[in-house]
Amino acid sequence: MRTHFCGLVDETLIGQTVTLAGWTDVARNLGGVCFIDLRDHEGIVQVTVEPVAGDDASAELFKVAASLGYEDVLQVEGVVRARHAVNDKLRTGKVEVIATRISILNKAAPLPFHAHENPGEETRLKYRYLDLRRPEMQRMQRTRIKLVQALRRHLDARDFQDIETPILTKATPEGARDFLVPARMHPGEFYALPQSPQLFKQILMVAGFDRYYQIARCFRDEALRADRQLEFTQLDMEFAFVRERDVQDFVEDMMRAIFKEVVDVDLAAQFPRMTWAEAMRRYGSDKPDLRIALELVDVAELVKSSEFPVFTAAANDADGRVAALRIPGGATLSRKQIDDYAAHAAKYGAKGLAYIKLSETGEVSSPIAKFFSEEAFAALLKHVGAGNGDIVFFGAGGYTKVSDFMGALRLKAGKEFDLVAEGWAPLWVTDFPMFEWDEEAQRYVALHHPFTAPAVDDIADLRANARTAVSRGYDMVLNGNEIGGGSIRIHRPDMQSAVFELLGIGAEEARAKFGFLLDALNYGAPPHGGIAFGIDRIAALMAGTESIRDVIPFPKTTGAQDLMTDAPSPIAADQLAEVHVQVRSKQV
């Protein structure tokens, strides 16, 4: 139906007859001439229709051109010629196609929005097929496609095996809720959609495949936001007979190559490394954005003898923290803006936010100054590096909570004061805690997942020091986004059972839920480790969008709906009966 793509018609084709197919981007009838911007996935070319006096065929052609509306689907035959007025905004702007034939392949109904408009997100998702026609959306989808193609080429060339793992599998506790699928042939029993291929890829290492990868679809029934979807795609990888640095060095080289190939970005020749403890101390986050130069400063030693009880209580608590954040130029903040920062911190658990503001002339404005002697106050300002024109925020309380809300303030200040440097800042965060204490459940939970190996090999040591145990987990962070997470796995069945026990999973429950894994580890499991990268998140970073929905062809809303297909939707009673499911009416 076509000889060339619209966006690739250029000067080399001048004088030649071409056949094009695409959508009517714009049609303009200027009376004596019609101009049609014809669009396909490669771009736009101008089609010109010039009626010839006394020529019935050209008059009919002009009539067809004059009748065209937005998004009508056309096949156009014509001769390429040089344009009198060059359009530098188009790749095809030096040429035009003089139409000799136009066939309307399909008429478009009146549009809810035009391809060059940017309507509300609900409208975009309801008419996703129209949204995806927009040049910006085409660009972002192509970025994703190039990313996946480049990853496959890179791994295939290095002897990784692309192996599929089951979509219908066993429900296992991995942090989020499972999506459940009733098993028709086994009444009362259910499959689960995988939250990740974690256990299958470990079993593939036991099976001797050595190097595995998969572009895997994963499913988690959890609350949605701009960087999270119910179903998502990850690059899943696993290596046999490796230590942490073996995995990290390989995927670091891979990321450098992929970013160069896909978006022509040169990532750092060596990614910096930081322990989890250092990241939390300096940045209040386990995924710090290193483009923002601001850092948290611990001030507990300077305030533990002050007369401000909020500070002294936290400073004298072994699990407490008093941290400061200096914002250069922050003295311009009004009282209302300071209250806005306090409200932002409250979203992350802050019960209050103290501050010291220094005017350009050195005048102090602070609700906490009265609690310090002149010498102690001066020492505090010196310790945090405060100068004229700055504001310093202070947070006090439990260590983790203070780190969280002060880290959130750091990000807010970085963006609002234009302190985010241009470029790309990759980072390895290592040595994560093995466990964290869940106050509500009154038990330990795994910070990564239950299959991450501890840094110690001795089970007695792990049991005795579970609260402070460090794991062999690691994350790759880019511009404040965790783009990959991995670890060295537990390969000994006795260690895996001990970790289950520490997580409150007894022997009987472990056997019921993970018996297949424990059995596999008993038959000569090699030391192994791996990592998984979020394809959606990396594609969004490469495409320059904050929402992963922009790089997913058919995403869900934050309300977990597909507006285009109207999913989820009710199921007929006979279908439910086939899978032995009854729906209870919603309790009011």
Curated annotation (Swiss-Prot):
Query: Can you tell me which residues bind ATP?
Result: 220-222, 229, 482, 534-537
Q: Which cysteines are joined by disulfide bonds?
A: none
Which reaction equations make up its catalytic activity?
A: tRNA(Asp) + L-aspartate + ATP = L-aspartyl-tRNA(Asp) + AMP + diphosphate
Q: Which CDD domains match?
A: AspRS_core, EcAspRS_like_N
Q: What does this protein do?
A: Catalyzes the attachment of L-aspartate to tRNA(Asp) in a two-step reaction: L-aspartate is first activated by ATP to form Asp-AMP and then transferred to the acceptor end of tRNA(Asp).
> What binding partners and quaternary form does the record give?
Homodimer.
Q: What is this protein called?
A: Aspartate--tRNA ligase
Organism listed in the record: Xanthomonas oryzae pv. oryzae (strain KACC10331 / KXO85)
Gene name, please?
aspS
